[in-house]
Amino acid sequence: MERVRGIGGLFFKAKDPERLRAFYRDLLGVPIEEWGGARFGWREHDARGDACTVWNPFSADTTYFRPSEAAFMVNFRVDDLDAMLAQLRAAGAPVDDRIEDGEYGRFGWVMDPEGNRVELWQPPH
């Protein structure tokens, strides 16, 4: 039986794609290419433990994405959550004051210019 081998891309609509690209490029360091998107190479040697991308449908009434009303949330892997959040705050981005520490690592959040909640994840060392 054939099966999917992983996530091939994440595609979504934006009210102001250029502003959104600038936010992700300038504040989060996403390597936006000339064609308008970004590619992230996936190599297991980049991982500090299990190498995976999580796919998980949440219940329609979840509050986990709040205050965003979007039906999705992107999670980006970062090396230093504290440094990333400080960088975002210094740029005036709306960063959630809460940080979660747990067995899966550390989590922080920021809202992008279109009101989407973005999760930042520092895997456990």
Feature map (PLM): residue ranges:
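Core segments of cupin and vicinal oxygen chelate
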Residues: 2-5, 11-55, 90
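Pocket-edge structural micro-motifs
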Residues: 42-44, 59, 122
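Vicinal oxygen chelate
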Residues: 1-15, 33-35, 43, 61-125, ...
